[in-house]
Amino acid sequence: MAKMLGAGRWGGCRSWHNLRARRPQLRRTTPVLVAIVLLFAAAASAQEMEPRTFSPSPVGTNFVVFAVNHASGSVLVDPSLPVTDIHASNTVNVLGLGHVFDLFGRQALITGVLPYANADVTGNVGGNAREVQRSGLADAQAKLSVLLLGGKALTPGEFAQAHHGMVIGVSVGVMAPTGQYYPQYLINLGTNRWATRLEGGISIPRGRWMFEGSAGVGLYGDNDLFYPGERHKSQQSIKGLQGHVSYTFRPRMWVAFDGTWYTGGRVDLDGVRGADFQRNSRLGATFALPLTRRQSLKFAYSTGATTRLGGDFDTFSVAYQMVWFGKRPTPPQVAPPPGGGLPH
């Protein structure tokens, strides 16, 4: 449940109603504040860096992931606006599930993610210090990935004997408006809209090295209940590129160096175009460490390389993963007819 820190804080309080009364100032300030809101819609975002997204796995592989992601830093805004010294901190606890299956002879992976977030935003509006805290569910996510080239559906036994070369895959991800959202608050954990991310990528192994590249686009639905509950918000697509170079020390133990660049995402409010066009890049690293045959840890860090507008965040995450393999269903045994012979 949302927790407000006293009077005069951000979201559904007297200070924002006063801003609403001063419409010209609100119109100039709101696009920046929308950028802050969008910081908590991470999953379909082009900002995420995911090495080995299109790695092959045997059919029947299942996994569960428990992860903690923390992001904190400043939010860069148009200096002409009366909003300064904005700092945001967001910790997300994630439960994820995944299953690899055979889709028309190709390897396919379906995943689902349920995030719970704790967010804190501070800053100065018109020279007055403001702060807001939120705690609750963020928007749930699901993604389907299919390997089109180099991703034949294989059993664990077949997979162990196969040669794994270049892989080309595609994915479609969906973010559902299941997160905590209050129209009377400007800053929310949920977005009150649907979002879709389409991505295609290539993975090329060379000995212990792996080289990956991908391109994607995020598409966003409209929010007809934007603050203070009577405004229409739409957002243009965000296009992004990713690149990863990883090195495998031994099976399931590897390190990757990651980079991403993304652009777009301008927000329109009631048909008025905002000045919040993004063109940013990030760099990071990921390390995977096996604990047992079926358990592993993954550590990741990233930081802003160039930030034109929006969140200039440092992010750190740690994830625990457990893997198990399902069994193929055994065909039912049909009892022979009396007499032991085949039926005529």
What positions do the PLM features span?
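Transmembrane beta-strands of outer-membrane beta-barrel proteins
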Residues: 62-64, 108-112, 142, 166-172, ...
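Residues on the lipid-exposed face of transmembrane beta-strands in outer-membrane beta-barrel proteins
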Residues: 66-68, 95-99, 142-148, 172, ...
